Each structure stands twice: as C-alpha cells, then as structure tokens.
C-alpha cells in the first residue's frame, strides 16, 4: 500500500486549494479526481468573487492560495460591486474563461512538487481505532495516509433531475460517488440532502443581443492576487434582459412537470439562488425577473443564462428561453437541471474542519452544506493547512470572526450547522468594517508566511506597507493646519467648511468632501510633509483615508472584538453534561451536546441561546472549576 502524508478526495475548488496547501507545506499529498480533465471545473457560473465572496478570494490569496491568481489570469470581465457604498461592503467579481481557468489550475496542480494526481473513484475510508489510515478506490486498491480531506462537492449520492427524468450523477456527464456516501453514513455521521441547479447554456450566434442591455467591464480594477502584475486585455461584455408574462404563464401552467413541485426532489434548495420555478411561484406579484447572459469564454459559443435555471423538461425549457426578448431563436447547447446530493452536518466538525468522530479526517466544501466556489476554496485551504499541521505535529490553524471572513464561515458552520445551502454575505460578518477586501493582505499575509505559504519577498513587501501606513497616519496626525483667510479660502474652493480651530491633516481627511489628493492644497505651508500626497502608493493612501474617515466606527468594532475575545478565552471543559444544568430548555441541551462548544463565545453564538441560558452554563463551569480545586461551590452567605 502506497503511503502519503495527506490524501485529498475530489479536485474541485476546495480540493485543489487543500492539496496545494498541504504539499506546499511539505507534505507528500495525493489528490484524487474521478476525471483529471475536470480539475477545478466551474460547474455552474463562469465567475469568481461577488458580494462577500470577493473578500474570501482575497483572503485565500493573502494566505498563499491559488484561486485569486487563476481568476486574474483567466478573467474576461471585471466588476466592483457596491462601488457607490462604503468600503466594508465593496466586493470584486470577475467572469473567467471557464476552460482557461480549468486548464490553468490543472497546470499548477500538475507542476506542484510533492503533489501527486490519480484518476479514480474513492469508495471507502480506512479507519483504525478512531484514526483515519487511508482510502480505498473502486478497484479495491488501498492508499495509506495520516490525514484525509474529503472535498466531493455535489458528487455524494448525486442525482440529476430534468423534468420527470432523473439519473445518478455528480454533475451532468460525470458519475456519482455513491459508495463513499454510504461509507460515511455507516460510520455514523449525521447526513442530510440538499439541492442546487444550473441554468441552460445558449449558443451565442443564435441570440439577438441588440434587444438586450449591454454591460461592459469596469475600466479600473484591482487584481485579486498580490502576485498579479498586470491583467489581460481581452474583455467580453455581459447582457441583461427580463422574463415576460409568457415566461411566467409557461411555468405556472406546467409546474406539475417540475420535480421541485411534484415532490420528487427532497433536498433543501438555496434560498438566495432560487430556481425560475421558485421565483415565479413564490413571487407572483413580480411581473418580470432579470436574466443575465455571460460568455463562458473567448473561444466558445456557450453563453451562461443566469436567471433561467430550472428543472423542467427540455421542450418546456426551450419555450421558456424563447419567451425572453432577444432569445426568441436561441439554441440550447446544454439543458438546465437540478441536482440533489448528500452533505454532512458540519456541527460534527471542530474549528479545524477535522471531524469529531474520526481523527485525521477533514471535510471541506459542499459536503459541509455550503454553496459557491469561493466558500469551497476557503474551506479547502483551511482543511489542507490543518491536515498538514496535524501530520507535522504543529499547532492547528484557526482564524476567529474578527480576523477573516474565512473565520466567520467556519465558525458559522461548526457552531450553528446548516439547514439550507450556506452562502457567505457581508451581513454575516459582524466586524466587516475591519475585514475589508482592501486590507486582506495586511491582515493575513503574515499568517501565510508563518505557515510557509508566502515567500519571504512578499512578506517583506507587506510588512513594509504596514510600516508605511502607520508612518503615514502618524505624519498626518502630527501636522496641524491653523485657521486663517488663506487656509479657509482653499477649503471653501474645495467645497469644504472653514475651520475655526487648529486641526491636523488626519482630522481634515475625516471630512467626506475631502480626499487624500485634496491635501495637496496646503503644500505651500511651511514644513508641509514632503510625502503628502505623492510619497505613498495608492494602496497605502487608500488605507490611511479609510482609517481616517471611519475611525470612530473602526474603533467601536475593535472594542467589540476585545469583548468577544474575552468570551472566547473562557474555555468550556470537555465532556460537559448539559443535561445537569438547570434552567436550560431541552432544545438548547440538545444543541449544546451536539455542537460541543469549546468556549463561552462559541456557545453564545448557538442559535436560540439566551443570556439566561449562557449565565447558567457559566455558573456550572465555575462550579466545576471550584470542585476541581477542592473548594465549596459557593461561599457562605452571612445573614
């Protein structure tokens, strides 16, 4: 039996990041995939990033991951979402050439030292005395490992639905992983069923784009990756259209043919990415729904028809597509379909994504009940890092909710579990003002360097930027502007109120009507800082300006983080008997026993937890601590 340090099962977005992280940290790693030609395949939309997802991609890159680099390399359309809003909710999104992305990632994986590829279907896990020891494939060949990461996406008991027809598949054209799903169930894991889907792909030459609204790429765009020096020049537009009353009539009149509404599909659908059937039936008051057409690549006729996802029979799909203005004569190249698959309830995982039931077994991606390439990649990297650290006998890697969107994602999964496909949103991150997309590198590159995933030169570059930001803030805070006719005239020329008392440049920069560049109006003042405004690069200027304009809000969030960390530092003894705590509801007792929170902070985030219940848990912890020290549980009370 061949032996490896780490085995990764599934080479999608989670699997690639897991395998690359483990091998780059020095572990001999084996990456399985059912088909090596579908490594990092974009099964659904041809895009990377989006609201809150862009933050995840930047964080993956800051830790030394690959998704951001591949997105930059293969992008053909760029957008900054929420550009008119504050920096806390701005996110980047790119459309990629789907085939170029797959090939680029495959090339990286193939060339990575210590990373071995093998095309096969893994059927079962090998476990001895509660410790993972390897896997066996469909031919019965065994492969040994000290740690195994499962990143199977929608392949566990996958079932594709098109109208009244359904067949086992991990996605259209690829076989499902049935034996591995059964293996996990036999091992005692609590599992559930979820459903997702994908819209039809249309032939570009059969679409009348003149009847649709064109959207071109944003001219100015920051790359996802720190290592990207320049972006490609080739661009493709997107097009917008809408469904019609005829579209909606076709769906309502034929809803009985939808497996979603006939009761055939049992899996839970994603609330935030509903099928067209759901949109029409649940939002009957809406006269139309948006349709977005996105090219899948530079050298293909395939167009992704976002908004037309459904699971109806092909003949009805054609009628629905043809009911959209501009698509009357369009040809379907690939039909839309729905897919059901098994997932493992993630409350059975530790914060490292290692399972509580089997040591050395890690789960990442859609197997944990999430949706989205970015959520999968973030989990894959997290699991791969921790698998490597465990093999090497090093402390685990965990980021908390104040350190990264990745930390929010993992904590939500293992603390609250999922009852529908989980998608990341900026609203899930309570500290989003300090977890911005623009400061991901400053937050996490030092951590990536400590793990051995970030090279020395990049680490030094980011360290210098951090130093320059601190220096720039100090510089602006130390130079004062005094009220006077000349000074106030300059301010009024820029549409900013006059000053009555001395203010620093940093205080002026807090004003919404002044930017960093506007500070140059005072360059003729004696001793004006020579590095302002041109002595700092654009990234440094942006960080200083955000720190100035949002200083009060940022400070409040940092104070909230201190309070949160105080709760996180209060450990809950392992094996706590929640049934013995008076005042807890049966529901909370079950949730606490199921999640097994490690800290008071984590217990506080369990759905349904109340202040009274949390106080009861803390009293029991204090009692156990006192009992351990041989003291009486409570001090005597004097009358």
UniProtKB/Swiss-Prot annotation:
GO biological process: tRNA methylation; tRNA wobble uridine modification
UniProt: NAD(+) binding residues: 269-283
Co-factor requirement: FAD
Localization annotation: Cytoplasm
Keyword Mitochondrion: no
Family annotation (Gene3D superfamilies): FAD/NAD(P)-binding domain (3.50.50.60), GidA associated domain, C-terminal subdomain (1.10.150.570), tRNA uridine 5-carboxymethylaminomethyl modification enzyme MnmG/GidA (1.10.10.1800)
Molecular function in Gene Ontology: flavin adenine dinucleotide binding
Listed Pfam families: GIDA, GIDA_C_1st, SAM_GIDA_C
Keyword set, alphabetical order: Cytoplasm, FAD, Flavoprotein, NAD, tRNA processing
Record-listed FAD binding positions: 10-15, 122, 177, 366
Family: Belongs to the MnmG family.
Matches recorded under PANTHER family: GLUCOSE INHIBITED DIVISION PROTEIN A (PTHR11806), PROTEIN MTO1 HOMOLOG, MITOCHONDRIAL (PTHR11806:SF0)
The protein's role, per its UniProt record: NAD-binding protein involved in the addition of a carboxymethylaminomethyl (cmnm) group at the wobble position (U34) of certain tRNAs, forming tRNA-cmnm(5)s(2)U34.
Name this polypeptide is given: tRNA uridine 5-carboxymethylaminomethyl modification enzyme MnmG
